[in-house]
């Protein structure tokens, strides 16, 4: 396992953490993975479980996860067409990581939200030009 060196730019992903974030990072991918951990889902099921995601964004995120081998898309030749998504073996290997993220969020959510509420808004911080 390579050590994470923030100044190492020799390889695109010199740090395994950066690579993992590239695969499952962003606002939606970890939520998609979390919901697929409980079993196979159709597109609209995932959409209902993550109501703030747009149809276009869900399509893009599912496609990226499929390209990376994290999820499997099964297309059934039916009318109307039926498509189901499930975790691959590689995707299932992320379950402990996603579960750890869930646990961390459950433990620390309240404290972080309190800190955010008490933070000084960025727009009210003095800058050199406002003095």
Task: Name the predicted role of every residue range.
Residues 1-12, 67, 72, 89-131:
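C-terminal regulatory/oligomerization modules of transcriptional regulators
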Residues 61:
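Residues within the DNA-recognition helix of helix-turn-helix
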Residues 66-86:
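Beta-hairpin "wing" of winged helix-turn-helix
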